[in-house]
Amino acid sequence: MEGSNRTVAAVILDLLAKEGVEKAFGIPGVHNLGFWNALSKERPEIVSVRHEQSCVYAADGLSRATGKLAVAITTTGPGAANTLGAFGEAAISGSHVLLISSEAPIKNRSTQGARGILHEMDDQSALFSPLAKRVTIDNEELVLAKSCRSADEAIATVVDFLKCLSVAPVGAGYIGVPADVLNQEFVGQIPQPSDRVMAFLGKLENEIIDLNPVMRLLTESKKIGIWAGGGATSVSSEIAELSNHFSAPIFTSFAGRGIGSASKNYLSIPIHEAEAENLLSECEILLIFGSQLDGMNTKNWSIKFPKKLVLFDANPRVALRNISADVVIESSKLAMIISELLKLEGRDQWADAAKISTETRKRVSLSDKGKAGMTLVSAIEKSWPIENNIVCDMAISGYWTGVYLHTNRPRQIAYPVGWGTLGFGLPASLGPSSTGLATLLVCGDGGIAFGLGELATVAQEQLPLTILLHDDGGYGMLRFDQQVMHHPERGVNLFNPNWKVLAQSFGIEFVDSDLNKLPEVLAKRSVSSAPAIVLITESLYPPKSTSPRWSEE
Protein backbone atom coordinates (compact mmCIF):
# COMPACT_ATOMS: atom_id res chain seq x y z
CA MET A 1 0.00 0.00 0.00
CA GLU A 2 2.99 2.35 0.53
CA GLY A 3 3.41 3.17 -3.16
CA SER A 4 -0.24 3.28 -4.26
CA ASN A 5 -2.56 6.28 -4.41
CA ARG A 6 -4.04 6.72 -0.97
CA THR A 7 -6.21 9.29 0.74
CA VAL A 8 -5.18 10.80 4.04
CA ALA A 9 -7.80 8.61 5.75
CA ALA A 10 -6.30 5.52 4.12
CA VAL A 11 -2.78 6.46 5.23
CA ILE A 12 -4.01 6.94 8.80
CA LEU A 13 -5.62 3.49 8.76
CA ASP A 14 -2.39 2.00 7.39
CA LEU A 15 -0.38 3.62 10.18
CA LEU A 16 -2.80 2.19 12.74
CA ALA A 17 -2.51 -1.27 11.17
CA LYS A 18 1.27 -1.01 11.37
CA GLU A 19 0.86 -0.23 15.06
CA GLY A 20 -1.06 -3.50 15.51
CA VAL A 21 -4.60 -2.12 15.53
CA GLU A 22 -7.00 -4.72 14.09
CA LYS A 23 -10.32 -3.18 15.10
CA ALA A 24 -11.45 0.38 15.64
CA PHE A 25 -14.84 1.54 16.88
CA GLY A 26 -16.85 4.33 15.36
CA ILE A 27 -19.92 5.88 13.81
CA PRO A 28 -19.93 7.17 10.23
CA GLY A 29 -20.92 10.77 9.58
CA VAL A 30 -20.97 12.94 6.50
CA HIS A 31 -17.54 14.36 7.39
CA ASN A 32 -15.64 11.17 8.26
CA LEU A 33 -16.81 8.82 5.50
CA GLY A 34 -13.27 8.85 4.15
CA PHE A 35 -12.35 6.24 6.75
CA TRP A 36 -15.14 3.90 5.63
CA ASN A 37 -14.31 4.50 1.97
CA ALA A 38 -10.73 3.39 2.66
CA LEU A 39 -11.57 0.12 4.42
CA SER A 40 -9.83 -3.00 3.11
CA LYS A 41 -8.66 -6.38 4.39
CA GLU A 42 -5.24 -4.95 5.21
CA ARG A 43 -6.67 -2.14 7.31
CA PRO A 44 -8.42 -2.17 10.69
CA GLU A 45 -12.07 -3.13 10.71
CA ILE A 46 -14.35 -0.41 12.06
CA VAL A 47 -17.01 -1.84 14.36
CA SER A 48 -20.09 0.38 14.12
CA VAL A 49 -21.58 1.31 17.49
CA ARG A 50 -24.78 3.25 18.18
CA HIS A 51 -23.51 6.28 20.09
CA GLU A 52 -20.26 8.21 19.80
CA GLN A 53 -19.57 7.87 23.51
CA SER A 54 -19.67 4.12 23.03
CA CYS A 55 -16.89 4.11 20.45
CA VAL A 56 -14.42 5.48 23.01
CA TYR A 57 -15.77 3.26 25.79
CA ALA A 58 -15.33 0.24 23.51
CA ALA A 59 -11.78 1.26 22.66
CA ASP A 60 -11.11 1.77 26.37
CA GLY A 61 -12.47 -1.70 27.18
CA LEU A 62 -10.30 -3.28 24.49
CA SER A 63 -7.21 -1.43 25.68
CA ARG A 64 -7.77 -2.47 29.30
CA ALA A 65 -8.11 -6.10 28.24
CA THR A 66 -5.04 -6.17 25.99
CA GLY A 67 -2.77 -3.35 27.12
CA LYS A 68 -2.46 -2.29 23.49
CA LEU A 69 -3.46 0.82 21.57
CA ALA A 70 -7.18 0.98 20.79
CA VAL A 71 -8.81 3.48 18.46
CA ALA A 72 -12.14 5.31 18.21
CA ILE A 73 -13.31 7.21 15.12
CA THR A 74 -16.03 9.83 15.21
CA THR A 75 -17.34 12.79 13.28
CA THR A 76 -17.24 16.56 13.60
CA GLY A 77 -18.73 18.73 16.34
CA PRO A 78 -21.50 16.98 18.29
CA GLY A 79 -20.09 13.60 17.32
CA ALA A 80 -16.74 14.42 18.89
CA ALA A 81 -18.35 16.20 21.85
CA ASN A 82 -20.47 13.13 22.58
CA THR A 83 -17.31 11.17 23.41
CA LEU A 84 -16.11 13.40 26.25
CA GLY A 85 -17.38 11.34 29.19
CA ALA A 86 -15.79 8.19 27.80
CA PHE A 87 -12.61 10.04 26.80
CA GLY A 88 -12.32 11.32 30.36
CA GLU A 89 -12.69 7.83 31.81
CA ALA A 90 -10.00 6.48 29.48
CA ALA A 91 -7.68 9.40 30.19
CA ILE A 92 -8.05 9.38 33.98
CA SER A 93 -7.73 5.58 34.11
CA GLY A 94 -4.61 5.61 31.92
CA SER A 95 -5.97 3.64 28.98
CA HIS A 96 -3.99 3.48 25.72
CA VAL A 97 -6.66 5.10 23.53
CA LEU A 98 -6.54 7.35 20.46
CA LEU A 99 -9.64 9.21 19.30
CA ILE A 100 -9.56 10.42 15.69
CA SER A 101 -12.31 12.73 14.49
CA SER A 102 -13.15 14.68 11.41
CA GLU A 103 -13.42 18.44 11.76
CA ALA A 104 -15.10 21.13 9.65
CA PRO A 105 -13.76 21.34 6.07
CA ILE A 106 -10.77 23.66 5.95
CA LYS A 107 -11.68 25.19 2.58
CA ASN A 108 -14.91 26.68 3.95
CA ARG A 109 -13.55 28.12 7.19
CA SER A 110 -13.08 31.76 8.07
CA THR A 111 -9.86 32.98 9.64
CA GLN A 112 -11.98 34.98 12.10
CA GLY A 113 -13.62 31.93 13.69
CA ALA A 114 -16.61 29.63 13.28
CA ARG A 115 -19.03 30.80 10.60
CA GLY A 116 -21.75 28.16 10.79
CA ILE A 117 -20.40 25.30 8.71
CA LEU A 118 -22.29 22.11 9.58
CA HIS A 119 -20.98 20.81 12.96
CA GLU A 120 -18.32 23.55 13.11
CA MET A 121 -16.76 24.93 16.30
CA ASP A 122 -13.79 27.22 16.88
CA ASP A 123 -11.37 24.73 18.42
CA GLN A 124 -12.51 21.12 18.59
CA SER A 125 -9.28 19.87 20.17
CA ALA A 126 -9.85 22.25 23.10
CA LEU A 127 -12.62 19.93 24.26
CA PHE A 128 -10.03 17.22 24.87
CA SER A 129 -6.93 19.15 25.94
CA PRO A 130 -7.69 19.20 29.70
CA LEU A 131 -7.92 15.39 29.72
CA ALA A 132 -5.40 14.33 27.08
CA LYS A 133 -2.00 12.87 27.87
CA ARG A 134 0.85 15.34 28.28
CA VAL A 135 4.57 14.83 27.76
CA THR A 136 7.32 17.30 28.61
CA ILE A 137 9.96 17.81 25.94
CA ASP A 138 12.80 20.26 26.65
CA ASN A 139 10.75 21.90 29.41
CA GLU A 140 7.84 22.41 27.02
CA GLU A 141 4.57 20.55 27.45
CA LEU A 142 3.18 18.69 24.46
CA VAL A 143 -0.55 18.06 24.84
CA LEU A 144 -1.69 15.05 22.84
CA ALA A 145 -4.82 16.79 21.55
CA LYS A 146 -4.46 18.56 18.24
CA SER A 147 -6.59 19.92 15.42
CA CYS A 148 -4.65 19.58 12.17
CA ARG A 149 -5.05 21.81 9.10
CA SER A 150 -3.28 19.96 6.27
CA ALA A 151 -2.54 16.47 5.02
CA ASP A 152 1.14 16.68 5.95
CA GLU A 153 0.35 17.96 9.43
CA ALA A 154 -2.26 15.24 9.99
CA ILE A 155 0.06 12.38 9.02
CA ALA A 156 3.00 13.83 10.97
CA THR A 157 0.77 14.22 14.02
CA VAL A 158 -0.43 10.62 13.82
CA VAL A 159 3.20 9.42 13.60
CA ASP A 160 4.27 11.51 16.60
CA PHE A 161 1.23 10.70 18.73
CA LEU A 162 1.56 6.96 18.16
CA LYS A 163 5.09 7.17 19.55
CA CYS A 164 4.16 9.38 22.50
CA LEU A 165 1.13 7.29 23.43
CA SER A 166 3.25 4.12 23.46
CA VAL A 167 5.39 5.14 26.44
CA ALA A 168 4.43 5.27 30.09
CA PRO A 169 2.52 6.77 31.72
CA VAL A 170 -0.23 5.63 29.42
CA GLY A 171 -3.03 8.01 28.48
CA ALA A 172 -5.50 9.09 25.81
CA GLY A 173 -4.96 11.30 22.78
CA TYR A 174 -7.10 13.18 20.26
CA ILE A 175 -6.39 14.05 16.62
CA GLY A 176 -8.78 16.12 14.51
CA VAL A 177 -8.54 16.22 10.70
CA PRO A 178 -10.65 18.47 8.43
CA ALA A 179 -13.21 16.50 6.42
CA ASP A 180 -11.86 17.65 3.05
CA VAL A 181 -8.30 16.84 4.10
CA LEU A 182 -9.31 13.27 5.00
CA ASN A 183 -10.38 12.73 1.40
CA GLN A 184 -7.33 14.33 -0.20
CA GLU A 185 -4.78 12.11 -1.91
CA PHE A 186 -1.59 11.92 0.12
CA VAL A 187 1.36 12.25 -2.22
CA GLY A 188 4.24 12.72 0.20
CA GLN A 189 6.45 10.28 2.06
CA ILE A 190 5.42 9.02 5.47
CA PRO A 191 7.59 11.08 7.83
CA GLN A 192 9.73 9.79 10.63
CA PRO A 193 8.82 10.95 14.13
CA SER A 194 9.80 14.57 14.67
CA ASP A 195 13.19 15.46 16.11
CA ARG A 196 11.51 16.64 19.32
CA VAL A 197 9.73 13.33 19.83
CA MET A 198 12.82 11.27 18.97
CA ALA A 199 14.87 13.30 21.45
CA PHE A 200 12.19 12.72 24.08
CA LEU A 201 12.16 8.97 23.47
CA GLY A 202 15.94 8.84 23.47
CA LYS A 203 16.07 10.61 26.80
CA LEU A 204 13.67 8.07 28.29
CA GLU A 205 15.71 5.18 26.91
CA ASN A 206 19.01 6.52 28.26
CA GLU A 207 17.80 7.70 31.66
CA ILE A 208 20.10 7.02 34.61
CA ILE A 209 18.45 5.56 37.69
CA ASP A 210 20.09 5.85 41.10
CA LEU A 211 18.71 3.10 43.31
CA ASN A 212 21.22 3.53 46.13
CA PRO A 213 18.79 5.43 48.41
CA VAL A 214 16.24 2.65 47.93
CA MET A 215 18.81 -0.03 48.63
CA ARG A 216 19.82 1.67 51.88
CA LEU A 217 16.24 1.89 53.11
CA LEU A 218 15.55 -1.74 52.23
CA THR A 219 18.71 -2.93 53.96
CA GLU A 220 17.39 -1.37 57.17
CA SER A 221 13.94 -2.98 56.85
CA LYS A 222 12.69 -6.48 57.65
CA LYS A 223 8.96 -6.14 57.04
CA ILE A 224 8.58 -5.04 53.42
CA GLY A 225 5.27 -4.50 51.65
CA ILE A 226 4.45 -3.98 47.96
CA TRP A 227 1.66 -1.84 46.51
CA ALA A 228 0.94 -2.43 42.81
CA GLY A 229 -1.17 -0.09 40.71
CA GLY A 230 -2.33 -0.03 37.11
CA GLY A 231 1.04 1.29 35.97
CA ALA A 232 2.63 -2.03 36.93
CA THR A 233 0.49 -4.41 34.85
CA SER A 234 3.43 -5.26 32.58
CA VAL A 235 5.60 -6.50 35.46
CA SER A 236 3.21 -8.88 37.22
CA SER A 237 5.58 -11.85 37.21
CA GLU A 238 8.49 -9.67 38.31
CA ILE A 239 6.48 -8.30 41.23
CA ALA A 240 5.49 -11.83 42.22
CA GLU A 241 9.18 -12.80 42.22
CA LEU A 242 10.12 -9.74 44.27
CA SER A 243 7.32 -10.49 46.71
CA ASN A 244 8.53 -14.05 47.20
CA HIS A 245 12.13 -12.84 47.60
CA PHE A 246 11.26 -10.29 50.28
CA SER A 247 8.30 -12.23 51.73
CA ALA A 248 6.38 -9.04 51.04
CA PRO A 249 2.57 -8.97 51.02
CA ILE A 250 1.16 -7.50 47.80
CA PHE A 251 -1.56 -4.88 48.08
CA THR A 252 -3.21 -3.80 44.83
CA SER A 253 -5.24 -0.84 43.66
CA PHE A 254 -8.44 -1.42 41.71
CA ALA A 255 -6.51 -1.09 38.43
CA GLY A 256 -3.77 -3.32 39.80
CA ARG A 257 -5.94 -6.34 40.59
CA GLY A 258 -4.14 -9.54 39.61
CA ILE A 259 -0.64 -8.07 39.58
CA GLY A 260 1.67 -10.48 41.37
CA SER A 261 -1.14 -12.98 41.92
CA ALA A 262 1.25 -15.88 41.31
CA SER A 263 2.90 -15.06 44.64
CA LYS A 264 1.75 -16.72 47.85
CA ASN A 265 1.90 -13.23 49.37
CA TYR A 266 -0.83 -11.80 47.13
CA LEU A 267 -3.79 -10.36 49.04
CA SER A 268 -7.16 -11.06 47.43
CA ILE A 269 -8.96 -8.59 49.68
CA PRO A 270 -9.11 -4.80 49.37
CA ILE A 271 -7.35 -2.36 51.63
CA HIS A 272 -10.82 -1.28 52.80
CA GLU A 273 -11.10 -4.40 54.96
CA ALA A 274 -9.55 -4.01 58.41
CA GLU A 275 -7.34 -7.09 58.07
CA ALA A 276 -5.65 -5.69 54.97
CA GLU A 277 -5.19 -2.23 56.45
CA ASN A 278 -3.77 -3.68 59.67
CA LEU A 279 -1.26 -5.72 57.67
CA LEU A 280 -0.29 -2.61 55.71
CA SER A 281 0.35 -0.72 58.94
CA GLU A 282 2.70 -3.49 60.13
CA CYS A 283 5.00 -2.98 57.14
CA GLU A 284 8.16 -1.04 57.91
CA ILE A 285 8.48 0.09 54.31
CA LEU A 286 6.14 0.06 51.31
CA LEU A 287 7.37 -0.22 47.73
CA ILE A 288 4.78 1.47 45.49
CA PHE A 289 4.82 0.53 41.80
CA GLY A 290 2.77 2.51 39.29
CA SER A 291 -0.03 3.84 41.47
CA GLN A 292 -1.45 7.32 42.02
CA LEU A 293 -2.86 6.29 45.42
CA ASP A 294 -6.12 8.09 44.67
CA GLY A 295 -8.94 8.71 47.09
CA MET A 296 -11.09 5.69 46.24
CA ASN A 297 -8.17 3.31 46.75
CA THR A 298 -7.13 4.83 50.07
CA LYS A 299 -10.41 5.88 51.68
CA ASN A 300 -9.48 9.47 50.87
CA TRP A 301 -5.94 8.91 52.17
CA SER A 302 -7.07 7.84 55.63
CA ILE A 303 -5.50 4.35 55.55
CA LYS A 304 -2.55 3.54 57.80
CA PHE A 305 0.47 3.89 55.53
CA PRO A 306 3.85 2.57 56.73
CA LYS A 307 6.36 5.14 57.95
CA LYS A 308 8.67 4.65 54.97
CA LEU A 309 7.38 4.92 51.40
CA VAL A 310 9.27 4.39 48.14
CA LEU A 311 7.55 5.39 44.91
CA PHE A 312 8.41 3.98 41.47
CA ASP A 313 6.41 5.67 38.73
CA ALA A 314 6.79 7.08 35.23
CA ASN A 315 4.96 10.20 36.42
CA PRO A 316 5.08 10.40 40.22
CA ARG A 317 3.65 13.92 40.44
CA VAL A 318 0.05 12.81 40.96
CA ALA A 319 0.94 10.33 43.70
CA LEU A 320 3.08 12.96 45.42
CA ARG A 321 -0.02 15.13 45.81
CA ASN A 322 -1.37 12.31 47.95
CA ILE A 323 1.63 11.02 49.92
CA SER A 324 5.09 12.09 51.02
CA ALA A 325 7.61 9.52 49.81
CA ASP A 326 11.06 8.98 51.32
CA VAL A 327 12.47 8.12 47.90
CA VAL A 328 10.97 8.78 44.46
CA ILE A 329 12.22 6.98 41.35
CA GLU A 330 10.76 8.55 38.22
CA SER A 331 11.00 5.81 35.62
CA SER A 332 8.96 3.38 33.56
CA LYS A 333 11.71 0.74 33.66
CA LEU A 334 10.09 -1.24 36.44
CA ALA A 335 11.41 -4.62 35.28
CA MET A 336 14.99 -3.39 35.38
CA ILE A 337 14.44 -1.79 38.79
CA ILE A 338 13.02 -5.01 40.22
CA SER A 339 15.94 -7.03 38.85
CA GLU A 340 18.28 -4.75 40.82
CA LEU A 341 16.21 -5.02 44.00
CA LEU A 342 16.38 -8.80 43.75
CA LYS A 343 20.14 -8.57 44.32
CA LEU A 344 19.49 -7.64 47.93
CA GLU A 345 19.26 -10.32 50.59
CA GLY A 346 15.88 -12.01 50.91
CA ARG A 347 13.65 -11.77 53.98
CA ASP A 348 12.01 -14.32 56.24
CA GLN A 349 8.27 -14.81 56.08
CA TRP A 350 6.56 -12.47 58.52
CA ALA A 351 2.92 -12.50 57.39
CA ASP A 352 0.59 -15.14 55.95
CA ALA A 353 -1.24 -13.18 53.24
CA ALA A 354 -3.09 -16.23 51.93
CA LYS A 355 -4.46 -17.05 55.38
CA ILE A 356 -5.45 -13.44 55.99
CA SER A 357 -7.25 -13.31 52.65
CA THR A 358 -9.06 -16.60 53.22
CA GLU A 359 -10.18 -15.75 56.74
CA THR A 360 -11.30 -12.26 55.76
CA ARG A 361 -13.30 -13.51 52.80
CA LYS A 362 -14.91 -16.13 55.04
CA ARG A 363 -15.80 -13.50 57.62
CA VAL A 364 -17.36 -11.24 54.99
CA SER A 365 -19.22 -14.20 53.44
CA LEU A 366 -20.81 -15.07 56.77
CA SER A 367 -21.84 -11.51 57.60
CA ASP A 368 -25.35 -10.23 56.99
CA LYS A 369 -24.02 -7.37 54.87
CA GLY A 370 -21.62 -9.48 52.83
CA LYS A 371 -23.33 -12.83 52.35
CA ALA A 372 -25.16 -12.04 49.11
CA GLY A 373 -22.28 -10.06 47.63
CA MET A 374 -19.74 -12.80 48.29
CA THR A 375 -22.18 -15.40 46.92
CA LEU A 376 -22.13 -13.41 43.68
CA VAL A 377 -18.32 -13.23 43.75
CA SER A 378 -18.03 -16.96 44.45
CA ALA A 379 -20.38 -17.81 41.58
CA ILE A 380 -18.20 -15.89 39.13
CA GLU A 381 -14.97 -17.35 40.54
CA LYS A 382 -16.31 -20.90 40.19
CA SER A 383 -17.68 -20.57 36.68
CA TRP A 384 -15.91 -17.87 34.68
CA PRO A 385 -12.56 -19.01 33.22
CA ILE A 386 -9.43 -17.07 34.12
CA GLU A 387 -8.59 -16.42 30.48
CA ASN A 388 -11.96 -14.78 29.81
CA ASN A 389 -12.58 -11.09 30.40
CA ILE A 390 -14.81 -9.34 32.91
CA VAL A 391 -16.12 -5.78 32.64
CA CYS A 392 -17.79 -4.07 35.59
CA ASP A 393 -20.02 -1.03 35.66
CA MET A 394 -20.61 1.39 38.51
CA ALA A 395 -23.14 -0.78 40.32
CA ILE A 396 -23.28 -2.65 43.62
CA SER A 397 -22.79 -5.93 41.76
CA GLY A 398 -19.85 -4.36 39.92
CA TYR A 399 -18.29 -3.10 43.15
CA TRP A 400 -18.36 -6.57 44.66
CA THR A 401 -16.95 -8.18 41.53
CA GLY A 402 -14.33 -5.57 40.70
CA VAL A 403 -12.91 -5.46 44.20
CA TYR A 404 -13.46 -8.85 45.86
CA LEU A 405 -13.08 -11.31 42.99
CA HIS A 406 -9.88 -13.33 43.34
CA THR A 407 -8.18 -11.99 40.24
CA ASN A 408 -5.64 -14.39 38.77
CA ARG A 409 -4.00 -12.14 36.21
CA PRO A 410 -3.68 -8.45 35.38
CA ARG A 411 -6.27 -7.04 33.00
CA GLN A 412 -8.77 -9.77 33.85
CA ILE A 413 -11.20 -7.10 35.08
CA ALA A 414 -12.04 -3.67 33.67
CA TYR A 415 -13.37 -1.51 36.49
CA PRO A 416 -14.23 2.18 35.91
CA VAL A 417 -13.23 3.61 39.24
CA GLY A 418 -10.76 5.90 37.58
CA TRP A 419 -13.19 8.67 36.91
CA GLY A 420 -16.15 6.72 38.25
CA THR A 421 -18.22 6.66 35.08
CA LEU A 422 -21.72 5.20 35.34
CA GLY A 423 -22.75 3.64 32.03
CA PHE A 424 -19.22 2.43 31.23
CA GLY A 425 -20.08 -1.26 31.36
CA LEU A 426 -22.12 -2.17 28.28
CA PRO A 427 -20.24 -0.07 25.70
CA ALA A 428 -16.85 -0.94 27.22
CA SER A 429 -17.64 -4.65 27.00
CA LEU A 430 -17.94 -4.31 23.22
CA GLY A 431 -14.16 -3.95 23.09
CA PRO A 432 -12.92 -7.21 24.61
CA SER A 433 -15.86 -9.24 23.28
CA SER A 434 -15.12 -8.01 19.75
CA THR A 435 -11.94 -10.12 19.84
CA GLY A 436 -14.08 -13.27 20.02
CA LEU A 437 -13.23 -14.05 23.64
CA ALA A 438 -16.21 -14.68 25.93
CA THR A 439 -16.71 -11.59 28.08
CA LEU A 440 -18.80 -11.13 31.23
CA LEU A 441 -20.41 -7.77 31.90
CA VAL A 442 -21.49 -7.17 35.50
CA CYS A 443 -23.84 -4.20 35.64
CA GLY A 444 -26.94 -2.72 37.21
CA ASP A 445 -30.21 -1.65 35.71
CA GLY A 446 -29.35 2.03 36.11
CA GLY A 447 -26.03 1.89 34.28
CA ILE A 448 -27.15 -0.29 31.39
CA ALA A 449 -29.91 2.22 30.60
CA PHE A 450 -27.23 4.71 29.51
CA GLY A 451 -26.37 2.56 26.50
CA LEU A 452 -29.26 0.23 25.71
CA GLY A 453 -28.81 1.05 22.03
CA GLU A 454 -25.58 -0.96 22.12
CA LEU A 455 -27.65 -4.12 22.43
CA ALA A 456 -28.11 -3.61 18.69
CA THR A 457 -24.32 -3.65 18.27
CA VAL A 458 -24.09 -6.80 20.38
CA ALA A 459 -26.77 -8.48 18.28
CA GLN A 460 -25.46 -7.34 14.90
CA GLU A 461 -21.88 -8.38 15.67
CA GLN A 462 -23.04 -11.52 17.53
CA LEU A 463 -20.56 -10.81 20.30
CA PRO A 464 -19.81 -13.54 22.86
CA LEU A 465 -21.06 -11.30 25.67
CA THR A 466 -22.89 -12.37 28.81
CA ILE A 467 -24.66 -9.43 30.45
CA LEU A 468 -25.11 -10.24 34.14
CA LEU A 469 -27.76 -7.68 34.97
CA HIS A 470 -28.65 -6.92 38.58
CA ASP A 471 -32.02 -5.18 38.72
CA ASP A 472 -32.56 -3.42 42.04
CA GLY A 473 -35.13 -0.96 40.78
CA GLY A 474 -32.93 1.97 39.84
CA TYR A 475 -29.77 3.51 41.26
CA GLY A 476 -29.20 1.13 44.15
CA MET A 477 -25.91 2.62 45.31
CA LEU A 478 -27.28 6.15 45.30
CA ARG A 479 -30.37 4.94 47.16
CA PHE A 480 -28.03 3.52 49.81
CA ASP A 481 -26.16 6.84 49.96
CA GLN A 482 -29.44 8.63 50.61
CA GLN A 483 -30.37 6.16 53.33
CA VAL A 484 -27.01 6.50 55.08
CA MET A 485 -27.23 10.31 54.97
CA HIS A 486 -30.90 10.22 56.09
CA HIS A 487 -31.99 11.91 52.89
CA PRO A 488 -35.32 11.23 51.18
CA GLU A 489 -35.20 8.66 48.38
CA ARG A 490 -35.58 10.88 45.34
CA GLY A 491 -34.53 10.28 41.75
CA VAL A 492 -33.26 6.77 42.42
CA ASN A 493 -36.31 4.52 42.01
CA LEU A 494 -36.69 4.04 38.28
CA PHE A 495 -39.05 2.38 35.81
CA ASN A 496 -37.44 -0.54 33.99
CA PRO A 497 -38.45 -2.40 30.85
CA ASN A 498 -39.42 -6.04 30.72
CA TRP A 499 -35.90 -7.37 30.30
CA LYS A 500 -37.03 -10.61 28.70
CA VAL A 501 -39.07 -8.81 26.05
CA LEU A 502 -36.23 -6.35 25.49
CA ALA A 503 -33.72 -9.15 24.97
CA GLN A 504 -36.06 -10.98 22.62
CA SER A 505 -36.59 -7.82 20.56
CA PHE A 506 -32.85 -7.82 19.82
CA GLY A 507 -32.73 -11.57 19.28
CA ILE A 508 -30.61 -12.01 22.41
CA GLU A 509 -31.00 -14.99 24.72
CA PHE A 510 -32.54 -14.22 28.12
CA VAL A 511 -32.00 -16.20 31.34
CA ASP A 512 -33.94 -15.40 34.52
CA SER A 513 -31.60 -16.57 37.28
CA ASP A 514 -30.74 -16.12 40.95
CA LEU A 515 -27.57 -16.32 43.00
CA ASN A 516 -27.96 -20.04 43.71
CA LYS A 517 -28.37 -20.97 40.04
CA LEU A 518 -25.74 -18.52 38.85
CA PRO A 519 -22.65 -20.81 38.85
CA GLU A 520 -24.33 -23.28 36.51
CA VAL A 521 -25.71 -20.53 34.28
CA LEU A 522 -22.37 -18.74 33.96
CA ALA A 523 -20.48 -21.97 33.33
CA LYS A 524 -22.68 -22.61 30.30
CA ARG A 525 -22.38 -19.03 29.15
CA SER A 526 -18.58 -19.01 29.41
CA VAL A 527 -18.29 -21.33 26.40
CA SER A 528 -21.04 -19.74 24.33
CA SER A 529 -20.27 -17.63 21.27
CA ALA A 530 -23.67 -15.90 21.31
CA PRO A 531 -24.84 -13.00 23.49
CA ALA A 532 -27.25 -13.29 26.42
CA ILE A 533 -28.75 -11.33 29.29
CA VAL A 534 -28.75 -13.09 32.67
CA LEU A 535 -31.02 -11.37 35.19
CA ILE A 536 -30.68 -11.49 38.99
CA THR A 537 -32.80 -9.47 41.42
CA GLU A 538 -31.66 -10.39 44.95
CA SER A 539 -30.83 -7.52 47.27
CA LEU A 540 -27.10 -6.74 47.52
CA TYR A 541 -25.64 -4.65 50.33
CA PRO A 542 -22.74 -2.45 49.15
CA PRO A 543 -19.22 -3.67 50.03
CA LYS A 544 -16.80 -1.87 52.34
CA SER A 545 -14.91 -0.49 49.36
CA THR A 546 -17.79 1.96 48.81
CA SER A 547 -17.38 5.32 50.51
CA PRO A 548 -20.51 5.28 52.74
CA ARG A 549 -19.00 2.28 54.56
CA TRP A 550 -15.43 3.53 54.98
CA SER A 551 -16.03 4.70 58.54
CA GLU A 552 -17.40 1.34 59.72
CA GLU A 553 -15.30 -0.61 62.19
PLM feature segments, named:
Residues 30-106, 108-122, 280, 285-294, 320-322, 399-553:
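Thiamine diphosphate
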Residues 11-21, 61-67, 162-169, 210-224, ...:
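Glycine-rich phosphate/diphosphate-binding loops that line cofactor/substrate pockets in enzymes
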Residues 122, 154-220, 347:
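Conformationally flexible catalytic loops at phosphate/diphosphate-handling active centers
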Residues 64, 228-314, 318, 408-438, ...:
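Glycine-rich, anion-gripping cofactor-binding loops and their flanking helix/strand elements
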Residues 9-13, 17-20, 27-40, 355-436:
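Active-site diphosphate/adenylate-binding microenvironment
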Residues 101-155, 254-354, 467, 482, ...:
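Glycine-rich, acidic loop regions that bind phosphate or pyrophosphate groups
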Residues 1-4, 135-152, 176, 189-190, ...:
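Phosphate/pyrophosphate-binding active-site segments
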